[in-house]
Structures are given as structure tokens and as C-alpha cells.
Design a protein with these regions (language model features):
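Walker B catalytic acidic pair
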Residues: 417, 444
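Short basic/glycine-enriched coil/helix segment immediately N-terminal to the Walker B
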Residues: 400-411, 431-437, 541, 654
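Accessory, non-ATPase domains that flank or precede helicase/AAA+ motor cores in DNA-metabolism machines
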Residues: 1-304
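Conserved ATPase-coupling elements of RecA-like P-loop NTPase cores
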Residues: 418-429, 449-456, 674
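C-terminal accessory regions
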Residues: 596-597, 609-725
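ASCE P-loop NTPase motor cores of helicases and related translocases
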Residues: 226, 231, 239, 243-247, ...
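Conserved helicase motor core of P-loop NTPases
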Residues: 327, 446-603, 614, 724-725
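Loop/turn-to-beta-strand initiation segments
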Residues: 364, 409-412, 437-441, 689
Length: 725
């Protein structure tokens, strides 16, 4: 039962767990009492804080304070001030003795002294003015935070979000947001229109505020990019914005159109007449237009001769099929060529042959892929060093070392997993290639899911044939049951559990007798509890990956990750994971499997990289191993917010990765997301075994449902034959 809202003050003397959105610890009050607390706040040991919230009785941890608001308590008596100065983790050069001198001399006048006469504080403490300058910055920042938090907590902003805003706007944060809350969308990553609009409504911002209408229009365009589209039809954009903004006026659509025309006139958005009038982000429009010009120009160039090419193909590629031979030949004689094919069609062997012939010709070959996992797999199977595209371009998190003025130095550049390459990355890549000196070979599987980002590069190129294109259609004899059954999905067929068996394992399992979602969930947990390791010999963390189409619901990634974390921590480490409060992110513990959700160039960890927590401290600091590289993640940092549990992942998130065993959840409750390219992409993540788990109708419907993923792209128009003429 919850009590009335109260406020408590004190010093944090212990932190049990801490993250950007949740902390638990122990507070020592000015009277010397100890209080256990937990809530949506971020604290560190020795912080002087004021917590607001309610007393609750937890079923496991007993009576504790549920914190809903945190302020840095700077209204300190001399004892508290000395403790704050001596123990604050960011204050350097002031130990207990110097802190006591400052507290005894200034007491309640410290705020005025540190703001207006910091030299006097330096003189009393006998420390350099630079040290007091750093202290002054921390003190004022905490004051600014308190001022901002006291105003903004009522609007639902968290401690972590307010900290970010104070760092951006300082003491003007409240005035800035009250004047125009939509500035959050422009200045702070992660603040989308809907979140900001909720804040604006609480502030009483009028619905017809110009910045709101403009922000809503831009949000609709950016939402299209998030869906993979590069443009929105003009009339459709007006309808979307009108539905989003709900302005409650008869002429709302006309008002929105006036603001849209203004955004176009200012160059904030761009419009173009295709089959219909469309609107787009100008950067994406420019990138696709320039890419189209690059591909068209390349397509106009004829082949260049390679001496004794047929003989080289006979020697190095004696086992090539005619299709593969054509792809290898194209790679060696054209400035841009494309090879695409499904699982088991022989793309890897063709790439290996390209590398072998290039070595004979003393040509420098570079291999790259969108993700670290895909690059490592390419390197392992081809036997030639490979890197991520970002590393190839020399990206340091801010700038690219390779561009048109400093192009990539290679004779042949092979890019694998091109289905994952979105328009911005493709544009960056071709900006860094001199096609008069370097041939680019694009390799992928056009039946896989398109990229997470905007565009549909691989399919647009396959459809247009603007560059020499080879589609490998023949499944090679050595492909095996797993790849044959995976390819059958493209024809709408789900084959039953395989008869063939290697040791205790089969390459293909279909478990389709569960119509109830909870039964599917129980079966999944049973596989981890009793089958995968004990009977099939798999490492439960490193060999097995659960794939599911959704994030929400009993069979979504969020709930499955919590359940699998609890099961595997108990099974493998004997650790009982505490309950995860509703609405909170689960904490990480040593042994957890995690995935990076956004690129982190400072740590050198890319989106989609799977890692393992080596160590997790009580304060929330993590040591994580990614493919042999160990990184340190501080609690409450942006790096920490980019990590998620990875026992279960969406299919898109692991595109380009492979695992010995993939468990693919396909249930009728997900039917609105089902289509055969999704299922095909999921099963082709497996190297040895696939386990299809769900109900028969759900699995078969997923394979039967054809979804033409026609994205709105400029390339699809610009590369049409008439556009190339």
C-alpha cells in the first residue's frame, strides 16, 4: 500500500543498482537514519539529494521509499556541505580537511561566495583558483538542475532527460522550453514529436503554434524515413499531418498546407513531381539523386579488357556454375557490378574466386560489410581480411577520413550484405570511391529484408539492371537441407522436421502445435531448460538466438528477454534475478547477453553487435565483451542506454549475423507482421539448425504471405529505363 507523497533529504551512502532511468540504494538522513529507496532517478554514491515520493511495502525488500523526483540538495548545513565537497565524485582536489575549512568559513553563505567571489574560497581552502573554478561549475550546474527539475518533473521528464537539457541550455532551459517546447525535437536526440507534444499540452501550448505545426509536418516526413521511405506524397503528407496535429479548426488542412509550402520555400523540405507531387528531406533527396547519377554513368561505361580472363576463370574457378562465372567476370571488367542470390546459391564461392584471380593479377582487393558480424563471417569464409563499411571509410564518430578528396585505395572493393545498406551509407561509400581506379562489386540477397534505414538500394538496382547484374538462381548441390528448406520458403513452402540427422541434431525442426501464446512461451523456456544444451549440445548464450517479429506482448522481445534472463541466470550462474518493476528497463548482470542498439563510435561498437557482460558492479558499471574487444560502460551514460538484452531479438536487428541455432517464433498473434521475406531472413540466420516454434497456421501464413516491400525511393524512378535515356 502506498502512503502520502513525502520528501526526504540525505546523503547516498550505498548504491545497489543504478542506470539512466532507475536506481536503488540507501540514504543517510541528517538525523543519522538509514532509508532504502528505489525509483525513476539516477544517483551516485555520496550524492546529497532530496527525494520526493511515497513509502511503499515491497513484497521482497520490505518497507522502502519509492522515489519519483530527485533534486541535488544544496541547502546544506556545514556538516552536509563538508561531506558534499569531500565526497562528490566529480569534485577533484578537495579532500575532507579542505572541505571542512570551506564549510566552517562560509557555511550558509557558500552559494554567494562560490558564485561571486570564488577567489576567496580558493584562499580559504589553499587550493588553485582552477580547482575552485571546477567546483564552481559543478555547484552552479547542480543549482541549474534543481531549478529545471522542479519545473520540468511535472511534465514527465526524467532525471536523465533534465540532465541532458541542462547541459544544452543551462540556466535558460525552463524559459526556452516554455517559449517553444518543440525546440527539443531540433536540439536533443531521442525527443520525437509525440513525446514533446505531450509536454507541450501540459504546458498549455496552443495547438496552432507555428512551431508545433512545422514540427508536426517534419515529424511526418521523418517518420517515413523511419519506415524506410525516402519521400511522402504531398497530399498524403497533408492528411498525415492533419491527423497528427488535431487542430480542431475547419481550415486546419489549409493552415497546414501554408506551413508546408513555407518549409519547402525555405529549403527545409523539398518537393518534386514524379508520378505525383512528393515531399522529402533534402539530404536524402540529394543523396539518392547523386547515387542515381553514379549508377547511370557507370552503366554507360563499357567493360575493360582483362588479359586471359577465360583461362584465369578456368584455373581459379573450375567449379563455378555459368551464373557464378558471369558474376566473377563482371566483377573483373566493370566499374560497378551486382551479384545477388539466396542461401546456398554460391555467392561466397564466387567472391573467393574474385579474390583469387585478383591476387594472380596483383590487384588489391578490399572486403567490407555493414556490420562487424557480417564482416567477420565474410573474412572467415573467404579467408581474406574484411572490415565494416564505417571502418573502411575511416569514420571516427564525427567525420569520415575517406571521401572524394581521399578515396579508398583498392583495385576491387567487394561489399557484402548490400540488402542492409541504406541510402546514407551507400552515398558515403560511393563518395569515397574513384570508379576510374576502383571496381565495386555489390553482393547480397534481394529476398532478405530491406535495410532498417531509408531506401531499398539492392532491390532498386536489381529491378533497374542499370549496372551489370547476376542473379544466382541455382542452389548448389552441397548446400544441404537447411539452405534448401530456407529457400523453399520463398515459394511459400514450409517443409516439415528434417529426416536427416547429424549426431543428436537435425538441421530443421518445426514445432507447430501450440495455438496459445503462453504454451509457445513455456515450450521456448523448456527448450532452454532441458533440450538445447543437454540433448543438442549447444552453448545457450553463444550458440542460440531467439528471433521474433515484435517487441511487445508475451512473445515479443521485451518479455521474452526478461523471462530468458531470469531462467539462464539461475541455470548457468545460480543467481535469482530480482523482479523488474513495471515500466522499467531490466538491469544487467554478469553473464548477460546484450546487443548494441545504436552505433557508438567512441567505444567502437556498432549497431547490432552482440556482447556478453563480463562484470556488473552494484552501481551499474558494466564491462562488456564484443567479439574479443572489452569495453567499459559507465552507469547512466549514453553508452548504457544503447544496450539491451539480446536473448531474444527482432529479425531486423540481427540481419547480417549468423548463429549455430536460430529459434524462430511465428505465431498467429503476429500475423499482421508476417510475410515470407521476414521468415526467410530469420531462418537464414542459422548455420546448423533452425527451430520454427509456434502454431501451424501462424508459421504457414508467414510463408504464404507475399509482401512486396515497395518503398518510396527516388532511385526506383531515377533508374527506370526512360530516366536513363
Amino acid at each position: 500500500m502506498k502512503d502520502q507523497r513525502e520528501s526526504i533529504r540525505g546523503i547516498v551512502d550505498a548504491v545497489f543498482c543504478s542506470g539512466p532511468t532507475f536506481s536503488a540504494g540507501r540514504l543517510v538522513t541528517p538525523e543519522g537514519g538509514e532509508v532504502k529507496f528505489a525509483g525513476k532517478v539516477y544517483v551516485r554514491e555520496h550524492d546529497a539529494v532530496r527525494l520526493e515520493g511515497r513509502w511503499v511495502t515491497h513484497s521482497k525488500y520490505g518497507r522502502q521509499f519509492e522515489a519519483e523526483f530527485l533534486g541535488h540538495d544544496l541547502e546544506l548545513d556545514p556538516e552536509g556541505l563538508a561531506n558534499f565537497l569531500a565526497n562528490h565524485p566529480d569534485i577533484k582536489g578537495i579532500g575532507p580537511a579542505k572541505a571542512r575549512l570551506i564549510a566552517d568559513r562560509f557555511g550558509g553563505d557558500f552559494d554567494a561566495a562560490i558564485r561571486n567571489d570564488p577567489e576567496s574560497v580558493a584562499a580559504v581552502a589553499k587550493v588553485p583558483v582552477e580547482t575552485i573554478g571546477e567546483l564552481r561549475g559543478i555547484w552552479i550546474a547542480n543549482r541549474d538542475f534543481n531549478h529545471a527539475m522542479s519545473h520540468l518533473a511535472a511534465y514527465g521528464l526524467t532525471h536523465h532527460q533534465v540532465t541532458t537539457l541542462v547541459g544544452k541550455f543551462g540556466s535558460q532551459v525552463v524559459a526556452t522550453l516554455e517559449r517553444d517546447p518543440y525546440v527539443l525535437m531540433r536540439e536533443i536526440p531521442g525527443f520525437g514529436f509525440k513525446r514533446v507534444d505531450k509536454i507541450a499540452r501540459k504546458m498549455g501550448t496552443p495547438k496552432d503554434l507555428a512551431s508545433r505545426i512545422r514540427a508536426g509536418i517534419q515529424y511526418c516526413v521523418l517518420s517515413a524515413l523511419d519506415d524506410g521511405d525516402c519521400w511522402v506524397e504531398y497530399e498524403d503528407l497533408l492528411d498525415r499531418a492533419n491527423t497528427l496535429l488535431v487542430m480542431d479548426t475547419l481550415d486546419s488542412r489549409e493552415v497546414i498546407e501554408r506551413h508546408l509550402e513555407a518549409l519547402i520555400a525555405e529549403g527545409v523540405l523539398v518537393s518534386q513531381a514524379l508520378e505525383r507531387l512528393i515531399v522529402a528531406d533534402p539530404e536524402i533527396h540529394r543523396m539518392e539523386t547523386e547515387l542515381a547519377a553514379i549508377f547511370r554513368e557507370s552503366g554507360r561505361r563499357g567493360p575493360h579488357a582483362v588479359a586471359d580472363l577465360d583461362a584465369l576463370l578456368d584455373v581459379e574457378g573450375g567449379e563455378l556454375t555459368p551464373e557464378q562465372r558471369g558474376a566473377v567476370s563482371n566483377a573483373l571488367i566493370f566499374s560497378i557490378s551486382l551479384m545477388t542470390g539466396g542461401a546456398g546459391s554460391g555467392k561466397t564461392y564466387a567472391v573467393s574466386t574474385i579474390v583469387s584471380i585478383a591476387d594472380r593479377l596483383e590487384r588489391k582487393v578490399l572486403l567490407a560489410a555493414p556490420t562487424g558480424k557480417a564482416a567477420k563471417r565474410l573474412e572467415d569464409v573467404v579467408g581474406h581480411e574484411a572490415s565494416t563499411i564505417h571502418r573502411l571509410l575511416g569514420f571516427n564518430g564525427h567525420t569520415y577520413a575517406r571521401d572524394s578528396m581521399n578515396p579508398i585505395e583498392a583495385d576491387i572493393l567487394v561489399i557484402d550484405e548490400v540488402s542492409m545498406v541504406d541510402v546514407p551509407l551507400a552515398w558515403r561509400l560511393f563518395q569515397a570511391v574513384d570508379l576510374t581506379k576502383t571496381a565495386v562489386v555489390l553482393v547480397g540477397d534481394h529476398n532478405q529484408l530491406p535495410p532498417v534505414g531509408p531506401g531499398n538500394l539492392l532491390r532498386d538496382l536489381v529491378k533497374s539492371r542499370v549496372v551489370p547484374t547476376t542473379i544466382l538462381t541455382r542452389i548448389i548441390r552441397q548446400a544441404g537441407v537447411l539452405k534448401e528448406n530456407s529457400t523453399a520458403i520463398l515459394a511459400g513452402e514450409v517443409r516439415p522436421t528434417a529426416d536427416v540427422q547429424e549426431g543428436a541434431r537435425r538441421p530443421w525442426y518445426v514445432i507447430d502445435r501450440f495455438s496459445d501464446r503462453e504454451d509457445v512461451r513455456r515450450m521456448l523456456l523448456l527448450l532452454f531448460e532441458e533440450v538445447l544444451q543437454e540433448r543438442l549440445g549447444y552453448d545457450l548464450l553463444r550458440d542460440v538466438q531467439v528471433l521474433t517479429p515484435t517487441h511487445k506482448g508475451p512473445l515479443g522481445t521485451a518479455e521474452l528477454n526478461i523471462a530468458l534472463q531470469r531462467l539462464l541466470q539461475k541455470k548457468l550462474r545460480g543467481f535469482d534475478v530480482p523482479d523488474v518493476p513495471s515500466g522499467h528497463r531490466p538491469a544487467f548482470y554478469a553473464g548477460d547477453k546484450v546487443i548494441q542498439t545504436r552505433n557508438d563510435y567512441e567505444l567502437g561498437v556498432m549497431n547490432g553487435a552482440v556482447g556478453y557482460v563480463v562484470e556488473a558492479t552494484a552501481k551499474g558499471a558494466l564491462t562488456v565483451e564484443f567479439d574479443g574487444a572489452v569495453v567499459e560502460v559507465e552507469p547512466g551514460s549514453d553508452a548504457a542506454s544503447r544496450l539491451q538484452l539480446a536473448y531474444a531479438c527482432s529479425v531486423h536487428k540481427v540481419q547480417g549475423s549468423e548463429f549455430p541455432c536460430a529459434i524462430v517464433v511465428a505465431h498467429k498473434s503476429h500475423s499482421f507482421m508476417h510475410h515470407r521475406n521476414l521468415l526467410y531472413t530469420a531462418v537464414t540466420r542459422a548455420q546448423e539448425s533452425v527451430i520454427l516454434l509456434g502454431d501451424r497456421w501462424g508459421i504457414e501464413n508467414c510463408a504464404a504471405k507475399r509482401q512486396v516491400d515497395r518503398r518510396n525511393t527516388f532511385l526506383s524512378f531515377l533508374l527506370e529505363p526512360e530516366a536513363r535515356a
